């Protein structure tokens, strides 16, 4: 499908396809915005951990969820600029950007209906998530509207949605519609549950995982991340990933 080539860019050289991930595109590192880092000190500690793991760029994605996390550019970007300033003062060589992780519900559909500008990263990518328990009645509508408005949708952690466990065909169909599937690295060590681990491995085996993300909320996720980056399926996923094309 030729249209997928525009969404899933080929890495600039063959080496970049198989090297370690140096760009993370899903995390909750901006303090006091959601259920991630609580303080500036927490944010800095996590950034230092990522640097020690060899990351060069972090695209952090605070939750935007109508009933719980009502973040906006006005709440997100001042925290981003403050953190970038502190990184510079401390000579921490990390590139830091911010987008968002949108929760797919009626509130999000209303944003799309208003043609409200969404927070994006890279090639106009929009990260969105679903309920872990129940499939969303809005998913086909959201995909259509996002693409119609020029966005490239990225589905966060599809392996964690229990209603899809054992049904890789459903996710293959979503992928075929031009949706990027982003698996959480920590799923590869069963951090969330064994069902999520199995699904993550199956999606990687199918070759339809284009992004791996840390989904880091705190130091507990860093500890699991260190183990997950040594797994067979982490290494198997690397050649198909586009994470490192996000390095500016």
Q: Across the structure, where does each feature detected by a protein language model lie?
A:
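Extended substrate/RNA-proximal surfaces in nucleic-acid metabolism proteins
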Residues: 2, 70-177
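His/Asp/Glu-enriched short active-site or ligand-binding loop at hydrolase and phosphoryl-transfer sites
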Residues: 178-190
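Hydrophobic faces of well-ordered beta-strands that scaffold small-molecule active sites
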Residues: 23-27, 58-60, 96-100, 126-128, ...
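Active-site environment of divalent metal-dependent phosphoester hydrolases
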Residues: 65-68, 103-105, 160-164, 188-191, ...
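Mid-to-C-terminal alpha-helical segments outside catalytic/metal-binding sites
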Residues: 3-4, 10, 226-248
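Short acidic/histidine-rich active-site segments
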Residues: 208-224
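An N-terminally biased module of ancient metal coordination in phosphate/nucleic-acid-related enzymes
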Residues: 1-92
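Non-catalytic positions within long, well-ordered alpha-helices that form the structural scaffold/packing
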Residues: 51, 147, 204-205
